[in-house]
Amino acid sequence: MRTPLIAGNWKMNGSSALVDAFGQAFADADLPESVEVVVHPPFPYLDAARRALAGGPVKLGAQTLNPLHAGARTGEVSGRMLKEFDVEYVLVGHSERRELYRESDDDVYDRLLAALNADLRPILCVGETLEARDAGRTRDVVLRQVGHALAPLEPAQRARVTIAYEPVWAIGTGRTATPEQAQEVMAAIREYQAGFDPALAQSMRLIYGGSMNAANAAELLAQPDIDGGLVGGASLKVDDFLAICHSAR
């Protein structure tokens, strides 16, 4: 049985007031015990979020990390540093990082490995552009990204990874993959995994990211191979994010 995971990615948004609002809301929220919830605020709010969420059901995540433990990398943050703030999860390979910061598949793998070595739980983001989808290359693009990141890992390392399928054309656009489109890709990822590790294919969580909101979450989460969501804009609205969490029960 795979535990549903709802992860809120604030991106470069939020404020101290929002951190406090989340802390208060989730302290009083009756979250389903069967659902795991994580929030990924920007780096400056990690400590405030740690304190605001302390003792509650919500775990803390980061949005990226540098592959190195330390060094001359101005503006960067290492996995070791994140652990000091009680961070448990970290995103790697988000489409915005791949596109805006030119992170290659090799870069994503390096960050994934760094996260695992720092005892963090990486959420590996994969997905295709609209051009690739229209060309019928969705499966090829997504499975290439998955394989490049996971194939070199040991089985115990792969077991710590969650995969987030985020069609690039559905991020921040208001467009959403239909439940059937999302399920088709998730099933392909699970089938690919089964080719070299059948047990892991059944236990690995696959979550959907791409304009998931309170209105469409239940239908997406009802698909057999969708085990949760990587939520962007809706994660900045406390009530909407709570509603999505309840949809995953």
Curated annotation (Swiss-Prot):
It comes from the Bacteria. GO terms for cellular component: cytosol. It catalyses: D-glyceraldehyde 3-phosphate = dihydroxyacetone phosphate. One of its GO terms (molecular function) is triose-phosphate isomerase activity. It is found in: Cytoplasm. The keyword Cytoplasm applies. Keywords: Cytoplasm, Gluconeogenesis, Glycolysis, Isomerase. Belongs to the triosephosphate isomerase family. This is Triosephosphate isomerase. It comes from Chromohalobacter salexigens (strain ATCC BAA-138 / DSM 3043 / CIP 106854 / NCIMB 13768 / 1H11).
